[in-house]
Amino acid sequence: MVLGVVGISYREAALKEREAVINILKTFEADTLLAQRFFGGDGSFVLLLTCHRAEIYYFSKSNANVQSKLLSWISSLGTRPYCYQGLACFTHLFTVTSGMDSLIFGETEIQGQVKRAYIKAKTDRELPFALHFLFQKALKEGKDFRSQVSLSYPVVTMESIVEETLDLHGKSTKDKLLFIGYSDVNRKIAKGLSAKGYRNLIFCSRKNIPIPYDTVARSQLSFGKPYDVIFFGSSESARDFPGLSLESLAGIPNRVVFDFNVPRTFTLVERPEGISYLDMDFISERVQKKLQISKQCTNKEKPFLALAARKQWEVYEKKSSNISLSQIRTSRPKLLIL
């Protein structure tokens, strides 16, 4: 039996490489036969795909070569993925969920991203006990960690990077800002800009929910209208929007476009002219320049998470052992009394 993870993050790969890895990992969701070949009939997986990481957590009863196959496939894209099994897999996901492995040290969004990845996986397919236990305990320990350990608020945030960038491009609080998608990242950016005095914030979302900002319906959306800044954060590609192209975006002079989607809304061969197109690589580079993560702080908190991971790993081993024994007993043929 193998429980493990293979993946890449912003440390190992640039945005273009992460996009390629995300695309191949998504094939497991689209091709059930491929998933069975990799993980076996009793195995399964959870994909954790965010702006800064692409990971597949897997369990297989029968295929001990899963890790080497995944490593070979991802490495063929020119990347150098990391991998962990058993206790190390527990420790890694606990560290990720707590925000200790994030680009912005201690950020809280990752907790929700891990939760949504787990919910999506268990909704889409049957998960084995191992993956249920791993993710449930990671979410629990991540929450407990934040409540027990005092972390200073990140000095650098995406909101501050966006605000600074708008200033550098000569944008003002009177400009019109269009947000495509009512996603976590768009809501966070809008909230931060609203606090700084930006008032012309307009959302366009597929969701039929109350939104505390001005809205425009998808049927009425036009990129030819004078939106000074556009934020893409809906996990959709350009082909999902009729009439959307880099040329249409460039129709408004000095327009600034933030593309928070990974994979990106546009597949770029070269940087477009006429607009300032800023993707997650731009955000990551700005954050890394400004944010110097304290290794002393990181190392100080790691034993807490490592201890929690070992504790839950030992519980998992006992529970999985009991499950195996129970399965063995129930599979034995009953003796006939003659």
Curated annotation (Swiss-Prot):
The keyword Ubl conjugation does not apply. PROSITE patterns: GLUTR (PS00747). It catalyses: (S)-4-amino-5-oxopentanoate + tRNA(Glu) + NADP(+) = L-glutamyl-tRNA(Glu) + NADPH + H(+). The active site is at C51 (nucleophile). Gene3D superfamilies: Glutamyl-tRNA reductase, N-terminal domain. SUPFAM superfamilies: Glutamyl tRNA-reductase catalytic, N-terminal domain. Its EC number is 1.2.1.70. Catalyzes the NADPH-dependent reduction of glutamyl-tRNA(Glu) to glutamate 1-semialdehyde (GSA). Possesses an unusual extended V-shaped dimeric structure with each monomer consisting of three distinct domains arranged along a curved 'spinal' alpha-helix. The N-terminal catalytic domain specifically recognizes the glutamate moiety of the substrate. The second domain is the NADPH-binding domain, and the third C-terminal domain is responsible for dimerization. This is Glutamyl-tRNA reductase. The gene is hemA.
